[in-house]
Amino acid sequence: GIDIDGNSNDVDITQNLNQSALIDITGASNTLNLNQTHLSNTGEHYADITIVGNSNVMDIDQTETGDKILFLDVDGSNNVTVDQKGTGDHFLDISLTDSHTLDITQDGSGDHNGTLILSGNNTSITLTQDSSSDQNYYLSQNCTNTSCSATVTQN
């Protein structure tokens, strides 16, 4: 189920066929849009999202054929946009603290895995996994500079 403590939270959730989203939001000024859609296709999506803190913006889409699984643990001020779409099985495990901006797309018929563990100062990550072959990416980073960034394209 969905558990929200705090105030000024905007949550929009749309699910279709075999969807499971466990969402826990604590704090204020959080916005979450989750759309797990298969429409007439078969399969399942899974999302486990925990948000603690404030000023968080999430947009998570898991669409169409293939199992998509997402774990997301957020603490602090973060912007996260995730698209897991296409026919392949895709997996993401994201853990964030402090100020981070993520833009992640996993698409194509390949089975893609991504794990991002970020802490420290502001980090901007753009990860694109779009291929018919399987792609894996792992990043564990503690940003000690004023800001850090990475752009990764696997196709």
Which residues does each predicted region cover?
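Low-complexity repeat regions of mature extracellularly deployed or surface/particle-associated proteins
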Residues: 1-155
